[in-house]
């Protein structure tokens, strides 16, 4: 067994706020004011989205470098959604400054479904991916 990632959170004085440490990095987590927090940092579901989009960006850049492909500047955005019936899903959107061929478009969508964090989340969360 290998530890892939590690993080620790310690409570702050303010309700819902915590100081997160992950490796050399430290940041604050909190809830939105509308949920009783002070919105001093990302909320837990924000971290799920952040992990997914960070892994997507890194994986696509690694793939492009390995294949000698120029993807140019692009962004990845994600929303965590839930409905009254209890269904949860993530909508992931990629936006490229340059025009992609249909072949590149399909390959990118395929790669997105194979990123390490995507695979982890797919074991318990449905993920919808689109390029906008």
Regions picked out by a protein language model, each given a short descriptive name:
Residues 52-56:
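Alpha-helical metal-binding/catalytic segments enriched in His/Glu/Asp
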Residues 1-49, 61-132:
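Extended beta-strand/beta-hairpin segments
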């Amino acid at each position: 067994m290998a530890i892939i990632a590690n993080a620790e959170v310690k409570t702050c004085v303010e309700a819902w706020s915590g100081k997160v440490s992950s490796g050399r990095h430290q940041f604050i987590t909190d809830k939105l004011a509308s949920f009783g927090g002070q919105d001093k940092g990302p909320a837990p579901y924000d971290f799920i989205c952040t992990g997914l989009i960070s892994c997507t960006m890194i994986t696509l850049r690694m793939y492009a470098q390995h294949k000698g492909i120029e993807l140019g500047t692009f962004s990845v955005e994600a929303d965590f959604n839930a409905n009254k019936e209890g269904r949860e899903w993530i909508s992931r959107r990629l936006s490229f400054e340059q025009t992609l061929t249909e072949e590149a478009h399909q390959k990118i969508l395929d790669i997105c479904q194979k990123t390490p964090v995507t695979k982890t989340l797919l074991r318990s969360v449905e993920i919808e991916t689109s390029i906008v």
